[in-house]
């Protein structure tokens, strides 16, 4: 067997060759290639004239000496047109009911059936057996069929509660395609002179029969780690609890997991990774509503749970809460304390600043950030003389929030312990402290917990970086996952700096 990374590189080059001359169809080609390499079926939904049939024709070139069968279904299609005509000679001479299958579906590796939902019951029943068992009953004999990929297409979905649902359930990958959208791609498509029948794949990249058979065994050996299974089970439970979620059979889950194994194998990995689970969005939907629902659920899973993002934020919240508790216990030691000077016959006490507050400008830290004047405030800068006047005579006190801009009016008081307390509009208050106490405000146990959490974050980010190579996942997903991890990392770093 080729080295995993060499195999991944080869499959990437093979896909690039198949995509040549097809515009905005890279994702569809890659998923159809994955389906072909793992022996699964694909349903393409979209209007006429958007290269659905060309996608299927291209996949034939992925294999050496592959045979293709293509047919447009109508209400009048007969089994003979799909599975081959009856042998008049065998029926006449030997009384045998036998089809001549050369050139028809039973002898093709790549099959494309357009307008699939127009097929009659006789075709559908035989097709179900072909998909499920890869066998075709030809008269008295069961013949094995070589089909590696079935691509079915239509511009509509099957009607609910119809006889077509059984066949629809067998189509593991479901892709909703549209016209070419980008202006440059549209122009390139219009002026392209490429012959659709040309083989764009070098012989060195084509898959041999021996390779294909060996890969089927290798795919089954790809492991499903417990953490990845837990993510899958979480998704299954979420879908079961949502009122409008599609029904997903156990058979479909099992086939989907094999597709994830194939994704891991052809990406050069020996185990399914969380990144592979994104493929489930193309496997578990039924209609437009469930397609959007699956997109949302997978985004929640990938950006919130797959790399422990939400769990790390929950831990961070617990650490911050514990730090606040410890800081509250130590607040009397760190809080800025003024000196009471008022006599017993004074109508109100007055205060003076302690000796250590001798600078002309004083910066005092909020022990807990507050939102003041629509700003998140962590420190306030006072003019020393203005603060002394307020401590002596009361009245209005102003300070620069975070040391910037004009001095703003503050709701500030001296509490019973002679500490300065500033309050926000909801009257939530926090004590002020000298900057020198800030470094000592974070207990050692909190520092250690934050260090451990940051190390865990680095491990998760490294895991994502190592696993993100997956040909079959759109790059947009990688950007969203990276952003979610960076957000967690930034919150941890901010907590360490507070």
Curated annotation (Swiss-Prot):
Q: Which key words tag this protein in UniProt?
A: ATP-binding, Chaperone, Cytoplasm, Hydrolase, Nucleotide-binding
**UniProt xrefs under CDD domains:** AAA (cd00009)
So which domain of life are we looking at? Answer: Bacteria
Question: What does the activity regulation annotation say?
Answer: ATPase activity is stimulated by ViaA.
Keyword Chloroplast carried by entry? no
Intracellular or extracellular location(s): Cytoplasm
Q: Kindly name one Pfam family recorded for this protein.
A: LARA_dom
- EC? 3.6.1.-
Could you tell me which InterPro entries the record lists for this protein?
AAA+_ATPase (IPR003593), ATPase_RavA (IPR023671), ATPase_RavA_C (IPR022547), MoxR (IPR045427), P-loop_NTPase (IPR027417), RavA-like_AAA_lid (IPR041538), RavA_ATPases (IPR050513), RavA_LARA_dom (IPR046898)
- Residues that hold ADP according to the record: 23, 49-54, 196
Q: GO CC terms for this protein? A: cytosol
| Family membership | Belongs to the RavA family.
**Subunit note:** Homohexamer. Interacts with ViaA.
| Protein name (record) | Regulatory ATPase RavA
In its UniProt entry, the species of origin is given as: Salmonella typhimurium (strain LT2 / SGSC1412 / ATCC 700720)
């Amino acid at each position: 067997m080729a080295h995993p990374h060499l195999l991944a590189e080869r499959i990437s080059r093979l896909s690039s060759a198949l995509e040549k001359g097809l515009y905005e169809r890279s994702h569809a080609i890659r998923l159809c290639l994955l389906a072909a390499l793992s022996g699964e079926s694909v349903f393409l939904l979209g209007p006429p004239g958007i290269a659905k049939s060309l996608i299927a024709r291209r996949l034939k070139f992925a294999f050496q000496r592959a045979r293709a069968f293509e047919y447009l279904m109508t209400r009048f299609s007969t089994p003979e047109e799909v599975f081959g005509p009856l042998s008049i000679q065998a029926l006449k001479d030997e009384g045998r009911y036998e089809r001549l299958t050369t050139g028809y579906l039973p002898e093709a590796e790549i099959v494309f059936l357009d307008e699939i939902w127009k097929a009659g019951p006789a075709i559908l029943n035989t097709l179900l057996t072909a998909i499920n068992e890869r066998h075709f009953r030809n008269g008295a004999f069961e013949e094995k069929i070589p089909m590696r990929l079935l691509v079915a297409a239509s511009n509509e979905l099957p009607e609910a509660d119809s006889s077509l649902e059984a066949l629809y359930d067998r189509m593991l990958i479901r892709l909703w395609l549209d016209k070419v959208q980008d202006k440059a791609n549209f122009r390139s498509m219009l002026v392209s002179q490429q012959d659709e029948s040309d083989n764009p794949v070098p012989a060195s990249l084509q898959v041999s029969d021996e390779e294909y058979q060996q890969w089927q065994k290798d795919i089954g050996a790809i492991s499903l780690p417990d953490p990845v299974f837990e993510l899958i089970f979480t998704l299954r439970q979420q879908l079961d609890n949502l009122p409008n979620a599609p029904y997903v059979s156990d058979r479909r889950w099992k086939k989907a997991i094999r597709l994830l194994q194939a994704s891991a194998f052809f990406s050069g990995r020996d185990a399914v990774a969380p990144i592979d689970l994104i493929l489930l969005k193309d496997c578990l939907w039924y209609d437009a509503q469930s397609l959007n629902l699956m997109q949302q659920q997978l985004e929640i899973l990938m950006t919130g749970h797959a790399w422990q993002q939400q769990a790390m934020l929950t831990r961070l919240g617990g650490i911050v809460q514990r730090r606040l508790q410890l800081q509250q216990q130590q607040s009397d030691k760190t809080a800025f304390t003024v000196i009471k000077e008022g006599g017993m016959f004074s109508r109100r006490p007055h205060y003076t600043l302690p000796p250590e507050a001798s600078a002309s400008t004083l910066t005092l830290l909020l022990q807990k950030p507050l939102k003041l004047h629509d700003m998140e405030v962590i420190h306030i800068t006072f003019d020393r003389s203005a603060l002394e006047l307020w401590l002596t005579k009361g009245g209005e006190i102003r300070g620069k929030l975070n040391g910037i801009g004009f001095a703003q009016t503050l709701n500030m008081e001296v509490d019973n312990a002679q500490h300065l307390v500033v309050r926000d509009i909801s009257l939530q208050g926090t004590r002020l402290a000298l900057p020198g106490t800030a470094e000592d405000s974070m207990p050692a146990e909190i520092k250690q917990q934050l260090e451990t959490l940051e190390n865990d974050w680095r491990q998760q980010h490294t895991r994502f970086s190592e696993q993100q190579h997956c040909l079959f996942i759109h790059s947009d997903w990688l950007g969203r996952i990276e952003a979610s991890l960076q957000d967690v990392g930034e919150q941890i770093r901010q907590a360490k700096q507070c």
